[in-house]
């Protein structure tokens, strides 16, 4: 049986006592080594949930357990040792004068010796394809390059869990593809548990499992293919449909009957080729 690396039980968070809760009675588990996507429209509460997992926002009710440690004010730093987090805007995360200084920052905070720090920084930059930018100022980089540097900083400290909080939302399509490809590779190499907070349904397709948050509540949980088959239900919650589902809808409008189950881009391409060859 797969071990749960995170357990969230009846979590509620309220920014102000005069406001409705941003999260209400949310419970779920995260399996060690899995990729979990948490999707929802803007303002649904998904980023509040992400920040609650490592104590950035102290929840009002409920409990969070990470790696067997229950999150409390006394244990928050033990929990954070296990988690690396990348946010939407990489500029808000940079503290170093150069790329390599920034990647080294987390190691310096952990009082890692320079003899150990230098090779770890070099290895982290190599893993994200940023070795040649080590001496550059972070401000001179593109958005995609900045997120790679932020990811290198996480790789260097070697956490068990990586949280991407809308980390690809400010990237162009190619930058998004490249970033997710690097995350997939790192996950395999380091047995990372990945939690992706996103409103991008195509990004959620990379996950093993998807949670849907709507108005602060967990309203659905399933594998991506089952979630994407919800169709109009996703649209009603302010989410987009995956490209392949849009394509299937367009085919139906033209009198063509596509597969009824969710198809990845590769599967849809194969189906189209077979359909064309049979006509």
From Swiss-Prot:
GO cellular component entries: ATP-binding cassette (ABC) transporter complex
UniProt-listed SMART domains: AAA
Start and end residues of each ABC transporter domain: 6-240
Topological type in the membrane: Peripheral membrane protein
Keyword list, A-Z: ATP-binding, Cell membrane, Membrane, Nucleotide-binding, Translocase, Transport
Cell compartments where the protein resides: Cell membrane
CDD domains to which the protein is assigned, alphabetical: ABC_cobalt_CbiO_domain1
Molecular function GO labels: ATP binding; ATP hydrolysis activity; ATPase-coupled transmembrane transporter activity
InterPro entries referenced in this protein's UniProt entry, alphabetically: AAA+_ATPase, ABC_transporter-like_ATP-bd, ABC_transporter-like_CS, ABC_transpr_CbiO/EcfA_su, ECF_ABC_transporter_ATP-bd, EcfA_1, P-loop_NTPase
EC number: 7.-.-.-
Residues the entry annotates as binding ATP: 40-47
Transmembrane segments: none
Gene3D superfamilies listed in its UniProt record: P-loop containing nucleotide triphosphate hydrolases (3.40.50.300)
Physiological role: ATP-binding (A) component of a common energy-coupling factor (ECF) ABC-transporter complex. Unlike classic ABC transporters this ECF transporter provides the energy necessary to transport a number of different substrates.
Family matches, as NCBIfam families: ECF_ATPase_1, PRK13635.1, PRK13648.1
Family the UniProt entry places it in: Belongs to the ABC transporter superfamily. Energy-coupling factor EcfA family.
Known partners and oligomeric status: Forms a stable energy-coupling factor (ECF) transporter complex composed of 2 membrane-embedded substrate-binding proteins (S component), 2 ATP-binding proteins (A component) and 2 transmembrane proteins (T component).
Name recorded for this polypeptide: Energy-coupling factor transporter ATP-binding protein EcfA1
